[in-house]
A protein has these predicted regions:
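Conserved catalytic phosphorylation-site environment of P-type ATPases
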Residues: 280, 376, 386-451, 534, ...
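Membrane-embedded alpha-helical bundles of multi-pass transporters
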Residues: 108-111, 143, 162, 404, ...
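Actuator/coupling domain of P-type ATPases
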Residues: 54, 58-76, 119, 123-224, ...
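Flexible metal-binding regulatory segments at protein termini and peripheral loops
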Residues: 1-116, 216, 232, 268, ...
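Conserved ATP-binding TGD loop and adjacent catalytic N/P-domain core of P-type ATPases
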Residues: 17, 38, 267, 412, ...
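Juxtamembrane helix-loop transition segments at the membrane interface in multi-pass membrane proteins
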Residues: 139-144, 205-220, 396-415, 632-639
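Conserved cytosolic catalytic loops of P-type ATPases
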Residues: 4, 27-49, 53, 183-186, ...
Length: 639
């Protein structure tokens, strides 16, 4: 059984890695994949061995939460959390301005000791209210032998605060008596929390954009429907509709569920209505619907009205299945992400070790006079290290890429399919139903090219799609059960050089296998049961949405419409998405590789008197996460 479960409380990639590790350790769970940007866990489990309650208890123990209750809305929880985060960020800035005013002597309390004590109270208030979640999370992580970004924030702010408290009450006696100049660093502890909260606020806002495609699809389902009861038509909540109910859909209204037309009329046609299905199929022209035709939830009659019998409701509608498929794809992981997750698990311990080494190096080399510098350098290292940027690099790009594909009526089942599609350099395609549309009225007595045209029609834009693929370095192979004459004719019409005639289902599979042995990365496009063997064997399998359910079940990618130009679009989107992933990872790693030494004070080795302070470190850390998300969102703007 597969289920996507909302997760509450994740802050960085170490969080998602810890949750994933915990879930995978439970008996009865076949696999679990946790996505930071989608805030969800995709879990494949045996309900007889492990329950959702068991999972929730295990995740609660390490400081997070799963939303499994029916009446509990993850969206509402996230909205409340965002509002609270916003309030804390604003209040933290007020605390920060106050502490900065005291430390810069803009506010004078008569003597330094009083000023330090006031700053202590302000910083303590900021930590207890605005920064409370960091310390609670860090403590829960510590109890379970884990660590995440909250651990770094909690550790760095506590060190800065406690060292400042020590200096406030004992600085004169301990340091001044030894001729050492001392300071308090309450401003550092406050500014770290302030910048981290601000960064998280901006990050949440930016991440919200990565999920816009799913929200738009969810918005396609109406909240109410018109049910026909005898001579009465009344408006009812969509949740009350049952299979078999008779519904009425008027011009401009959304079809509430999947069903079968029992009556239709329009101004142009007495016994038919015209429905806009572009949001599902991508077809720009309205589809004519008569008695007995199928209608889909979320589509809109733009000419006429109809009555329909409900056949699939709730989670069984085509729209609900599409949404579920996209959510699962966005929650799945590309192979490169699994490497990043392993790095995230050791990232915080490694950074903590670097911070300790930094502290000891400054203290041993400089002695007690450099103890404040040693502490500040260690704090800066703890703060500037950012596992978030690495953790967000892959999933945010995948979420945007898969969401954009869905907007183009390209449904991608998992992240590996999107990643593998960019490598494709050979495409095997079925003919009938994939490249051509069979005509209903066929005259089998004719044998010339005119007869071929009468039997089936090349899909609009099929030739353009095949030529675009070949220009992009993809060799196209057409497989047909037709005789040589017909296969050659349609291959030429579609602009395809390689073709085979009189093929059986195993011949398609054999061609895919042969191309793979030649070192090619092969995609297979088909629409029928006779294509499933080849689809299953191909590196990337692509089904036509109007084909059989069997083909769509086997395929990793489904094209919902008949416009084959979505094939090269999918290839282009795959290449852009993977390029974006590597861009994000490159800058995330470069950020940590460059900034951690600068925070430690490495430039002093070259007689350059400069390093990144804890306050600036927190600002840079926040910016690094936001920049990764914003960079991924550029995919939405690419044509």
């Amino acid at each position: 059984m597969k289920r996507t479960i909302p997760v509450i409380g994740m802050a960085c990639s170490a969080c998602s890695a810890n949750i994933e590790k915990k879930l995978n350790s439970l008996n009865g769970i076949t696999s679990a994949s946790v996505s930071l940007p989608s805030r969800s866990a995709l879990v494949d489990f045996n309900p007889d061995e492990v329950s959702l309650t068991d999972m929730k208890a295990a995740i609660n123990a390490i400081g997070y939460d799963l939303v499994i209750e029916e009446g509990r809305s993850a969206v509402e929880i996230e909205k409340r959390a965002y509002t609270l985060l916003k309030r804390k960020a604003i209040l933290s800035w007020i605390f920060a301005i106050g502490v900065m005013a005291i430390s810069m002597h803009w506010i004078n309390f008569g003597n330094n000791n009083t000023s330090n004590q006031v700053a202590l109270l302000v910083a303590l208030g900021n930590m207890l209210y605005c920064g409370k979640q960091f310390y609670v999370s860090a403590w829960k992580q510590l109890k379970n032998g884990l660590a995440n970004m909250d651990t770094l924030v909690a550790l760095s702010t506590l060190i800065a605060f406690l060292f400042s408290v020590f200096n406030t009450f004992w600085g004169e006696a301990v340091w001044s008596s030894r001729g050492i100049v001392w300071h308090t660093y309450f401003d550092a502890s406050v500014m770290i929390i302030t910048f981290v909260l601000t960064g998280k606020l901006l990050e949440e806002k930016a991440k919200d954009g990565t999920a816009s495609s799913i929200r738009e699809m969810m918005g396609m389902t109406p909240k109410t429907a018109h049910i026909v009861d005898g001579d009465k038509v009344e408006e009812v909540p969509i949740s009350t509709i049952e299979v078999g109910d008779l519904l009425e859909v008027r011009t401009g209204e959304k079809v509430p569920v999947d069903g079968e037309v029992v009556w239709a009329e329009s101004f142009m046609t007495p016994n038919a209505a015209y429905i806009d299905e572009s949001m599902i199929t991508g077809e720009p022209n309205p589809a004519k619907k008569e008695k007995g035709d199928r209608v889909l939830a979320g589509t809109i009659p733009n000419q006429g009205k109809l009555r329909m019998r409900a056949r699939q409701i709730g989670k069984d509608t085509m729209l609900a299945q599409i949404i579920r498929m996209v959510q699962e794809a966005q929650g799945s992981k590309a192979p490169v992400q699994r490497i990043v997750d392993k790095a995230a698990l050791v990232f915080v311990p490694v950074v903590s070790t670097i911070a300790l080494v930094t502290f000891l190096a400054w203290w041993i080399i400089g002695g007690n006079a450099y103890l404040p510098q040693a502490i500040l350098s260690a704090i800066a290292v703890l703060v500037i290290a950012c596992p978030c940027a690495m953790g967000l690099a892959t999933p945010t790009a995948l979420m945007v890429g898969i969401g954009k594909a869905a907007e183009e009526q390209i449904l991608i089942k998992d992240a590996s399919a999107l990643e593998n599609l960019r490598k494709i350099n050979a495409l095997v395609t079925d003919k009938t139903g994939t490249l051509t549309i069979p005509n209903k009225n066929i005259d089998f007595t004719k044998s010339d090219n005119l007869a071929l045209e009468e039997r089936e029609t090349l899909k609009p834009n099929a030739r353009e799609a095949m030529e675009t693929l070949q220009k992009n370095g993809v060799e196209v192979y057409m497989m047909s059960g037709d005789k040589e004459e017909a296969a050659k004719y349609w291959a030429e019409k579609a602009g395809i050089k390689h073709y085979q005639s009189k093929v059986l289902p195993q011949d398609k599979e054999n061609l895919v296998r042969r191309l793979q042995t030649e070192g090619k990365h092969v995609a297979m496009v088909g629409d029928g049961i006779n294509d499933t063997q080849a689809l299953a064997l191909a590196d990337v399998s692509i089904a036509i949405g109007k084909g059989t359910d069997v083909a769509m079940d086997v395929a990793q990618i489904t094209l919902m419409g008949d416009d084959l130009r979505t094939l090269p679009e999918a290839l282009q989107l795959s290449r852009r998405t993977v390029r974006m992933i590597w861009e994000n990872l490159f800058w995330a790693f470069i950020y940590n590789i460059v900034c951690i030494p600068l925070a430690a004070g490495v430039l002093y080795l070259f007689d350059i008197d400069w390093q990144i302070t804890p306050s600036w470190a927190s600002a840079l850390m926040a910016f690094s996460s936001v920049s990764v998300v914003l960079n991924s969102l550029r995919l939405k703007l690419m044509k």
